[in-house]
Amino acid sequence: MVLDPIINGYHLTRVLMDGGSGLNLIYQDTVRKMGIDRTKIRHRTTTFKGVVPGLEARCTGSLLLEVVFGSSDNFRSERLTFYIAPFRSGDQALLGRTAFARFNAIPHYASLKLKMPGPCGTITVSGNTECSLRAEEHAAALAAEH
């Protein structure tokens, strides 16, 4: 499901929520475009397996970033650790199981909705159908390259 949260003050439009992933990833290109100070990157040696078919990659560090879902009158904010992925993707970031757990979020894949508790009731975030299809096509093209 492709969503558009605010991450570290930036409204991102292609963030994949993937309940099958054990990590939150942010891609090097996204970090560069967000202008994040390189001194905030923590050294990590985490290895990714299964993110890109047939490849194994080592992250280039990690960042603690604030993620916000909802509207100005009913929102949730959580600080999540993101591992910096050294490869390309059609997405700007990937939120895994830890994000689902921290936000107490429940995905509804058939209707492309993500629901979570907020201070003023349930927050419902709609997924972007067009972006979801494009992201899937892009991932398939990247897999075919390798």
Across the structure, where does each feature detected by a protein language model lie?
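A short acidic-Thr-Gly-centered motif at the start of a beta-strand
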Residues: 1-12
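Aspartic protease core domain of the pepsin/retropepsin superfamily
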Residues: 19, 23-146
